[in-house]
Amino acid sequence: MAVFASGSYDPDSITKYSSITEQIPRRSIQDPETYQLIKDSKPVVITDTNLVTSASKWDLEYLNKNLGDGLFYVYTSNDNRFKYFDNKRAEKCKSFVTPSERHHVTFLQFLQMLKRCARTKEKVYLQQTLNDSVGTNIVTDFLQFNWDWVNKCQAAYGWGSLSSNLLLIGLEGNITPVHYDEQENFFAQISGHKRCLLFSPDQFDCLYPHPVAHPCDRQSQVNIANPDYKKFPRFRNAHATEAIVGPGDVLYIPMYWWHQIESLSSRIPPVTISVNFWYRGTPLPDVIQYPLSPQQRVSVMRNVEKMLAAALGDAEKVGELLRTMVEGRYTQ
């Protein structure tokens, strides 16, 4: 492994992808372009928000002392890909093989799992919504986040309420594969570095999402590190924009933008720590303007798929119905 400076990341840990065509802009909190990009639902890295400065001391030792005795969701995988799946849907789908295992453990048990990973090829990823089970010091740190700035952004762009703050602690090399969320996201980096690849919503047909009723709803079926072009030919036309975020950076990930997040190799301990600020989207306007935006088109497609599944009483029959409707009528 290459030698690299403390607090930096190993450039050799960056995978090369042919689909990357541009860099996400990095802007100051004082730059008017920052807010124009957010207004236009375009990604931007904001370098000086001080959004989570009070959490800069959140290393593993501090968190172990102060997170409390609550339980945390920790995922384990034999490879480095942590593809999201809906646990309730997975239980109902007998043929579905979960891409990772979910555990409900204390933070001390998570640290023990981290130590075990040093001796095995297993990877672990803690993904837990911050709640009232945390200790008082964490609460104090949380209250000192730059809420004034995010609240002003929420009001300025007409977003809905804050739905959750997700704490993410991952090993170097961990990947959250390509997916999109139905919420606005300020992704705040606390420790370590992450590489973020984003694809715009108008590339929906290039990224082959699972059906809405599938346990991996909103996830792409394409492994962009090793794409199967025979199965997913339109992925050749996909193009991503990327950024590497470090401590103090905040990446705005607009709703319905596809993204893949990769934890880069860094100094010991080899973990990255991040917090999501997820906000519900802007309510639908009273008057719909045409043409629809790419985000609105994705929303329409999701709703149509859901309604058809409900009407048919079987989500498995949706594809057959759509093919019957379209083939020979709209494919000539």
Q: Model-derived features: where do they sit?
A:
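N-terminal accessory scaffold of Fe(II)-dependent oxygenases
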Residues: 1-250, 258-332
